[in-house]
Each structure stands twice: as structure tokens, then as C-alpha cells.
Curated annotation (Swiss-Prot):
This is Sentrin-specific protease 1. The modification Phosphoserine is found at S57, S117, S157. Pfam families: Peptidase_C48. Signal peptide: none annotated. The keyword Nucleus applies. Belongs to the peptidase C48 family.
């Protein structure tokens, strides 16, 4: 068979590296061998690198990646034919065939193998030199009979690196989307930013467990520039992992092939799953030697960056526990500067808003003052124009105003007469403990006991006897000169009228003409609250007073209906309601109680001021004074 047929057709023991376009043959070693200790020793030996007139020399172990310690074969490995101190080297002859350069340690009968395979395995030499390639496993002497019969001839092929590049990067075999440099850069920068953010937040170092799918060219340049540091890390991790890289000679320095990390990793994963060795290629600028890469163990994840001495490029196969340097705080200097600027701006904005609010408040205050001044000016001008025809009467008006002021002062003094010491002692004596049924005052067919007087002490609620007695004293005072005539109904009157109607209270006014008086006082009890309704015949009005600001127009309508029925029953005529008005005083118009116990006192004092035709000018602060004063008035049956 000719040379072409040798390069194309292969026996069961031949393996063709399609990516390289070269055919390698392996031969079965003889049956005889050496002990297992020698095998282990020969596998662990460092394989020296020879340089001479040949283009390159390679060494290779004879154990397949699928080798396991529990695997037993009848045919021992060819390593058994080597002594413990022997080193196998292979050179390239002038005709392109591989020859054995290792001197024979002894002669032994040889037998061809029944099945032949190409065994590739990753090794790392202890000397840290480049990885080497082994072609055959039975070269224990200069030339064997089998080798003479079946010489190994490499198949003609184009440039090694070019064929590898075309075979691995060919779009026909693997169709994948290639990311642009900009996209890869953006992805890597986003990932780096997120990693640094996690490091700042947690205070821990975060490392990338494996390289990204698309490795940026910028990072590759950084790795090639730091080849010395990578070599040191390779030497330190020599006992944990081993990887070999096959490179190719290039016809020119510009024809170097580049493999991405994604293709290498995917190809390695496929080779591990199928049990075949993984071959990766890369070109070196200054070193034309070839390197073969194969996984060390399927269950181990080695990571090594291999490069030849004097090389300017590096090929990253895997990364194992890569130590990412601590991120520099300068990366976030721009963000910190933005935050600082924003905080300064926010403080200035708050200060500016505060000043604006102050100016608005000041402007509003000045505007109100200006409006008040304008109102006063308008009122003064109107009053001036009205007084011009009455200029001669101005002194008389001034004199009248002076008298009114003096009269108001005397009224205010009479409104709150002072309680003397004797009065104070008498009041305290009544509040002392004693017989609760003791009668302290009796008038108007009413009896006031000590128990009733105790309702005026502190914040107690007033009862019906106290309110009815006080209303009768108001009626008695109205008989005096200068006071309007008053009739006060009993505290049970309105409740009876509302629930039972007019017929239930018809006989209550048998001896009284309600239409002959000026004012009718109607105390209204709402269960837990006292109010007052006032019927003023002089003003034709019915007004409702509530110290809690309540509105009760219904009570006013009930009283108006009562007047109609009372007029028909007593006078035998219809009551004229023309001009009558119903009111409910608002909380802004009358004093309001500030607790939950003075409602009875407020109702009584409303009636006191109304029956004197005086304005209601007391407040919640006057209630303690009014309680003491009412005690004295009830005891003496006389209003102050």
C-alpha cells in the first residue's frame, strides 16, 4: 500500500486527528513487562525537552484518560519496558517520520497489539517547561522490527494552525451567535460592577468561579501582559492539575489563531462526556512547538494557563479558584461625588425653600395688616361723612359714650361680685360631711337638702332640685323693677311635652298666663346633658342654647307648636306665628364648656344673663366661682 493509502486508511489501532490532518499510529507493546512500581515511577518522571537541529521533540505518557486503577490488562503498558531512570524522547527524522532517541535499556521480545489506540494524557513536568507530545508507546529501543515493517508517515496537510483554526472555528460545524466586542465589554463591566457592589455591601471577597462565556479581548491582553505571574501560579499548582496545549507553526507572525474560552470549554466538556481526549490549538509567536491539552480527571476541575517561554500570547483553558484582586475604591469615586453633590444641593434646596416659606408668611402678614388698615380707613371715612351733617351733636355723643363706658364698668363689677370671707366659711361649712337628708333651704314649694347641695361641689352634676330652685329665684327676681318678666318651666316639662304631647302638660299652666310674660325659660334634659330653650315674646324668637355646640331645631318647633295649642286652649284664638324665628346658637356665639360636668351650670348662667338682658360674657374659668356663689344664693334664697 502506498503512502497515500497509509495516510487515509487506518487499522483498528489507528486514530486520525481530523483537525490536524495527520495520522498517528500506536503499536501494542510486547507481552513481557516490568513490575507496577516501575510503571508508576516512569509516569511521574519529568520529560526533558531537547532542542537541536530538529524542529521539535515531544514526550507523551502512555496512559489513556479512560484509565482507572482497577483496570487490568493482559498486555502490560509499554512503560514497563523503561527503567526507573529512563526518559523517552522522540525526534523527527529528515523524512518527517518520528524516531526514538532513547537508548534501549534492554532487549525483550515484542508482539504486536491486538487493538491499538492513541493514548493522550495531560502531564505537567516538575521543571515547569512546556508540555510535550508522545506519538508511540513501544519505542524502548532505537528501532523495533514492527517499526521497520510499518513505518509511521505523517499525512500531508496544510499549516497546522490554519487547519486547526478552520476546523474548530468553522461555522459549518457549530453555529453560534458571536457577540461583538462592545456587548462583551458591557456585560463584563456590568458583572464587575455588581461584584464590587456585593463586596462593598457584605465586606467579603467575591471571586469568579469560572470564566464567562464570552471572554473580552481586553482581559486577554491583560492576561498576556501578566504572563510571569501566571507562570508562577502554574508552578505552584503543578501538583493539583495538568493541562497540555498543542500549538502550531505559523507561516507568518500575523497568521496566529485565536480560540475563545467558550469554544475551548464546550469542546472540553464534549470530550469528557464521550471519553475521548480533548485537543486545543494555539499559535506562539516565538516558539513553534506544539502542545496537546487533555483533561486530568473527569471529576476534577483543573485550571492552568500554559504558555511557552518567550511567548507573547496566552490561551486560557480553565480558571480554578482565581483570586480576583480587591476592587479599587476609585471605581465608585464618580458615584460618591454625585452623592456628595446631591446632598449639598438638597441642603441648599431645603434652605432655599425655608427662606421662601418665611418670605411667604411675612408677605401674608403684611398683606393682612394692609387690608385691616384699609378697612379701618374705609370705616373712618364713612363715619366721617355721616357725621358731617351732625357736627354740632358730636360733643353730646361723646358724653353719652363716656356714660355708657362708666355704666359698663359698674355692670362688670356687679356681674361678678366678690365672695367675702364670711361667705366662704359658710359655703365650706355646707360642703362638710353631715346628715345628707338635712334640709338646708326651702322655698317655692321646693326643699334643698345637704345631698342636693353636694352636687354643686367640685365637678359634680347638678340635679333637678338645684336647677328648679335656681329657675324659681330667677322668676322671683324678675318681679323687681328693671327686669323683664320671666316664667320658667319645670325640668320635666319639655320631656313630658315631647313624649306625651300637649294634653299631658295642659294643666301645668292652669294658674299662669304664659303669653303675659316677656321670657319663657324651658330647661331641657337630654339624658346626660342639660340645655336651655328661651322663648322671647318681645323679639318673637325661640332660641336654643347648648354648651356643647349642639343644634336642636326640633325642640324649637315643639315649643312653637305648644304656643299654638296653648293659645287655642287658653285664649280661644289662633296664635299668630308671623315673624317668629327659630334659632340654635352656634358654638362660636356662646361660651362652651371644656369638661363633662358643667353643662347644668352653663344652662343656669345662660338663663341668668338672658333674664337680666345682659350679654353672656362668662367662660369655663368662672365655673368654680359660680358654683360657690350659687350655694350661697340657694342658702339665702337670693340672687347676688
Amino acid at each position: 500500500m502506498d503512502d497515500t493509502a497509509d495516510g487515509v486508511k487506518m487499522d483498528a489501532g489507528e486514530v486520525t486527528l481530523v483537525n490536524h490532518g495527520s495520522t498517528f499510529r500506536t503499536h501494542r507493546p510486547p507481552q513481557s513487562g516490568f513490575p507496577e512500581e516501575q510503571l508508576l515511577l516512569s509516569d511521574q518522571q519529568s520529560l526533558p525537552f531537547r532542542q537541536g537541529t530538529l524542529d521539535g521533540s515531544f514526550t507523551c505518557s502512555t496512559r489513556s484518560p479512560a484509565y482507572r486503577p482497577d483496570y487490568h490488562s493482559d498486555n502490560p503498558s509499554s512503560d514497563s519496558f523503561l527503567g526507573s531512570g529512563d526518559v523517552r524522547t522522540f525526534g523527527q527524522s529528515a523524512n518527517g517520520q518520528w524516531r526514538n532517541s532513547t537508548p534501549a535499556s534492554g532487549s525483550a521480545p515484542q508482539k504486536p497489539r491486538n487493538s491499538r489506540s492513541l493514548c493522550l494524557e495531560t502531564r505537567k513536568t516538575s521543571s515547569g517547561l512546556s508540555n510535550t507530545f508522545v506519538g508511540k508507546s513501544n519505542h524502548h529501543c532505537h528501532m523495533s522490527a514492527y517499526e521497520k515493517s510499518f513505518p509511521i508517515k505523517p499525512a500531508p496537510s496544510p499549516s497546522w494552525s490554519g487547519s486547526c483554526r478552520r476546523s474548530l472555528l468553522s461555522p459549518k460545524k457549530t453555529q453560534r451567535r458571536h457577540f461583538s466586542t462592545a456587548e462583551e465589554t458591557v456585560q463584563e463591566e456590568e458583572k464587575e460592577i455588581y461584584r464590587q457592589l456585593l463586596q462593598m455591601v457584605t465586606g467579603k471577597q467575591f471571586c469568579v468561579a469560572k470564566p464567562t462565556t464570552h471572554f473580552p479581548l481586553r482581559l486577554s491582553r491583560c492576561l498576556s501582559s501578566n504572563k510571569n505571574s501566571l507562570k508562577d501560579s502554574l508552578l505552584r499548582n503543578g501538583n493539583s492539575c495538568a493541562s497540555h496545549v498543542i500549538g502550531s507553526d505559523t507561516s507568518s507572525s500575523g497568521s496566529a489563531s485565536i480560540l475563545t474560552a467558550q469554544e475551548q470549554l464546550s469542546h472540553s466538556a464534549h470530550s469528557l462526556s464521550s471519553g475521548t481526549p480533548d485537543v486545543a490549538f494555539g499559535s506562539k509567536d516565538s516558539d513553534p512547538h506544539h502542545h496537546l491539552a487533555a483533561p486530568h480527571q473527569p471529576n476534577s476541575l483543573p485550571a492552568s494557563n500554559t504558555q511557552s517561554e518567550g511567548s507573547d500570547s496566552v490561551i486560557l483553558l480553565k480558571v480554578k479558584e482565581s483570586q480576583t484582586p480587591a476592587s479599587s475604591p476609585t471605581f465608585f469615586q464618580a458615584e460618591l461625588w454625585i452623592k456628595e453633590l446631591t446632598s449639598v444641593y438638597d441642603s441648599r434646596a431645603r434652605e432655599r425653600l425655608r427662606r421662601i416659606e418665611e418670605q411667604k408668611a411675612l408677605a401674608l402678614q403684611l398683606q393682612n395688616q394692609r387690608l385691616q388698615e384699609q378697612e379701618h380707613a374705609v370705616l373712618d371715612s364713612v363715619e366721617l361723612h355721616l357725621r358731617v351733617p351732625l357736627e354740632k351733636e358730636i360733643p353730646v355723643t361723646a358724653a353719652q359714650e363716656t356714660r355708657k363706658k362708666s355704666h359698663q364698668l359698674t355692670d362688670s363689677e356687679d356681674e361678678f361680685p366678690e365672695i367675702t370671707e364670711e361667705m366662704e366659711k359658710e359655703i365650706k361649712n355646707v360642703f362638710r360631711n353631715g346628715n345628707q337628708d338635712e334640709v338646708l333651704s326651702e322655698a317655692f314649694r321646693l326643699t334643698i337638702t345637704r345631698k342636693d347641695i353636694q352636687t354643686l361641689n367640685h365637678l359634680n352634676w347638678l340635679n333637678d332640685e338645684i336647677i328648679n330652685f335656681y329657675m324659681n329665684m330667677l322668676m322671683e327676681r324678675s318681679k323687681e323693677k328693671g327686669f323683664p318678666s320671666v316664667h320658667a318651666f319645670n325640668t320635666f316639662f319639655f320631656t313630658k311635652l315631647k313624649t306625651a304631647g300637649y294634653q299631658a302638660v295642659k294643666r301645668w299652666t292652669k294658674k299662669v298666663d304664659v303669653f303675659s310674660v316677656d321670657i319663657l325659660l324651658v330647661p331641657i334634659h337630654l339624658g346626660v346633658h342639660w340645655c336651655l330653650a328661651v322663648v322671647d315674646f318681645r323679639r318673637k324668637s325661640i332660641t336654643y342654647y347648648d354648651s356643647m355646640g349642639g343644634i336642636n331645631n326640633e325642640a324649637c318647633r315643639i315649643l312653637l307648636q305648644y304656643l299654638k295649642q296653648e293659645s287655642v286652649d287658653k285664649k280661644r284664638k289662633e296664635f299668630d306665628t308671623n315673624g317668629w324665628q327659630l334659632f340654635s346658637k352656634k358654638s362660636q356665639e356662646i361660651p362652651q364648656q371644656m369638661n363633662g360636668s358643667d353643662c347644668g351650670m352653663f344652662a343656669c348662667k345662660y338663663a341668668d344673663c338672658i333674664t337680666k338682658d345682659r350679654p353672656i360674657n362668662f367662660t369655663q374659668q368662672h365655673m368654680p366661682y359660680f358654683r360657690k356663689r350659687m350655694v350661697w344664693e340657694i342658702l339665702h334664697r337670693k340672687l347676688l
